[in-house]
Amino acid sequence: AANQHLCGSHLVEALYLVCGERGFFYSPKTXXDVEQPLVNGPLHGEVGELPFQHEEYQXXGIVEQCCENPCSLYQLENYCN
C-alpha cells in the first residue's frame, strides 16, 4: 500500500486494523516505556528476544509520523502493543 496521511479517526481506524486485539499506543510516556513496552503484557518473558525498533519511530510520536507526514503500514505496526 502506498504511504498516506492519516489523521484523527482515520489514524485510529488504521491502527485498529493493523494491530487488532494487540492494541496500540500513540507515543511513549517515558523512556522506560519504549525499552519495555510489554512488561505487563502476555509476552512478559519474551520481550528481550524481540527486535524492537520503536525508538526511531516514537521519537516524534505517531501523529507527526503519519498525520503531518505520510506513513506506511509497516510504520503503523511499530505502534502496536
UniProtKB/Swiss-Prot annotation:
Disulfide bond sites: 7-67, 19-80, 66-71
Highest rank taxon of the organism: Eukaryota
Localization: Secreted
GO biological process, one term: glucose metabolic process
Pfam families per record: Insulin
GO annotations of cellular component type: extracellular space
A single MF term (Gene Ontology): hormone activity
Gene3D superfamilies: Insulin-like (1.10.100.10)
Residue ranges annotated as propeptide in the record: 33-58
Keywords: Carbohydrate metabolism, Disulfide bond, Glucose metabolism, Hormone, Secreted
Described function: Insulin decreases blood glucose concentration. It increases cell permeability to monosaccharides, amino acids and fatty acids. It accelerates glycolysis, the pentose phosphate cycle, and glycogen synthesis in liver.
Family affiliation: Belongs to the insulin family.
Subunit: Heterodimer of a B chain and an A chain linked by two disulfide bonds.
Name of the protein in its database record: Insulin
Organism: Anas platyrhynchos (Mallard)
